[in-house]
């Protein structure tokens, strides 16, 4: 069974939650939101949410359950020489894999295989967790892009969160609940909870990213179609294709 068939067998007809790392989740939502996340049949965490150090924060707001970690596994340093790749350790933190839950699916939702380098580094640990790895096929990747483009034209590689929303919808869930990702609509709270990045990674990007939103006229801020994704997210919410939390529902009302 390839990874897409495996995912479809888990997702089709089920209640699915996608939970991202936005800080508003622990600032604006009730402290039983984590229990609500855990009540879904399948929970998908995004990108660097492999391990959360703050267990109280996790339990109350983001949930302790996860079946799939959907990620770009983009461990490369694309933030310039001011950021030390080996200090911020995005996807290269041994602690993440040591604390990985058994039988987790590690899904690279882009048609490449960056995880292979991570796997080589932590093979013994990852194998001990009986984790399943797979990356999307080019065909399904383009099919997902086609779906997103039907809603709003995108001309850059989508973010992990938006790709996973599209992919899950194509797998026909009974319900898809999305929380913890705003496509950088939120200007009140940081885009990531504390300790999502190790060290002062976000601070080093302050010339074009203030921790909340990007300055879209700066070169390093244009590698994803953030503004187009905001329109896609709003369309999905307004047309009842996905369910979202109360804070995110209010945020998308800003989108024209």
Segments predicted by a language model, with ranges:
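Metal-ion/cofactor- or nucleotide/acyl-coenzyme-handling active-site neighborhoods
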Residues: 1-256
């Amino acid at each position: 069974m390839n990874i897409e068939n495996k995912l479809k067998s888990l997702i089709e007809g089920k209640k699915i939650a996608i939970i991202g790392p936005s800080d508003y989740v622990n600032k604006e939502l009730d402290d039983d939101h984590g229990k609500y996340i855990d009540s879904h049949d399948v929970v998908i965490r995004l990108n660097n949410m492999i391990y959360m150090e703050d267990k109280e924060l996790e339990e109350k707001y983001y949930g302790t359950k996860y079946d799939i970690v959907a990620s770009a596994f983009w461990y490369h340093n694309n933030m310039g020489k001011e950021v030390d790749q080996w200090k911020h350790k995005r996807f290269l933190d041994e602690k993440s894999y040591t604390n990985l839950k058994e039988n987790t699916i590690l899904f690279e939702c882009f048609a490449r295989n960056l995880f292979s380098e991570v796997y080589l580094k932590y093979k013994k640990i990852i194998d001990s967790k009986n984790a399943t790895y797979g990356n999307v096929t080019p065909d399904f990747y383009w099919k997902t892009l086609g779906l997103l483009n039907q809603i709003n034209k995108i001309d850059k590689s989508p973010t992990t969160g938006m790709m996973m929303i599209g992919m899950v919808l194509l797998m026909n869930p009974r319900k898809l609940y999305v929380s913890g990702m705003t496509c950088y609509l939120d200007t009140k709270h940081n885009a990531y909870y504390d300790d999502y990045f190790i060290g002062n990674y976000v601070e080093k990007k302050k010339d074009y990213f203030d921790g909340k939103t990007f300055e879209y006229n700066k070169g390093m801020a244009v590698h994803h179609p953030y503004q187009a994704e905001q329109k896609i997210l709003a369309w999905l919410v307004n047309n009842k294709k996905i369910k979202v939390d109360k804070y995110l529902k209010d945020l998308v009302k800003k989108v024209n």
